Design a protein with these regions (language model features):
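C-terminal terminal-subdomain/extension
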Residues: 62-113
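Compact nucleic-acid interaction/catalytic patches
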Residues: 19-23, 28-63
Length: 113
């Protein structure tokens, strides 16, 4: 499956026992890493408490597709994901929305110029 930055995908993550797993949506933040990896930002549907380092994902943020539930990005938790654990693609954020989330990420980690 072809994935690129701004895609939102469903991934299977194993717990430390390597026997049980959970499927989680992830924003593909940077996709041109070696070894078929990408930098992902986790997504949660637990939107009751929205922290300063989290951002709501609205249906209007998508250029195609959407998530099944209202959700938020957890910007403080970027991590490396193997493309081998991607189950399916939910959709793609519009370029304007993806740019906004990149800016929020950089603001949080103070990596802006």
């Amino acid at each position: 499956m072809e994935i690129k930055a701004a895609d939102i995908v469903l991934c299977e993550f194993y717990f430390s026992d390597l026997k049980t797993s959970k499927n989680r949506p992830v924003l593909v933040f940077k996709d041109n890493l070696p070894f078929d990896d990408f930098v992902g930002i986790p997504i949660s549907s637990q939107i009751i408490h929205l922290h300063a380092d989290e951002a709501l994902i609205e249906s209007t943020d998508f250029s195609e597709g959407l998530l099944p539930k209202s959700s938020k990005l957890m910007l403080r938790k970027p991590f490396i994901v193997s493309k081998k654990v991607v189950i399916k693609k939910y959709g793609t954020l519009s370029s304007g929305s993806f740019d906004r989330y990149q800016q929020l990420f950089c603001d949080y980690f103070q990596c802006c110029e």
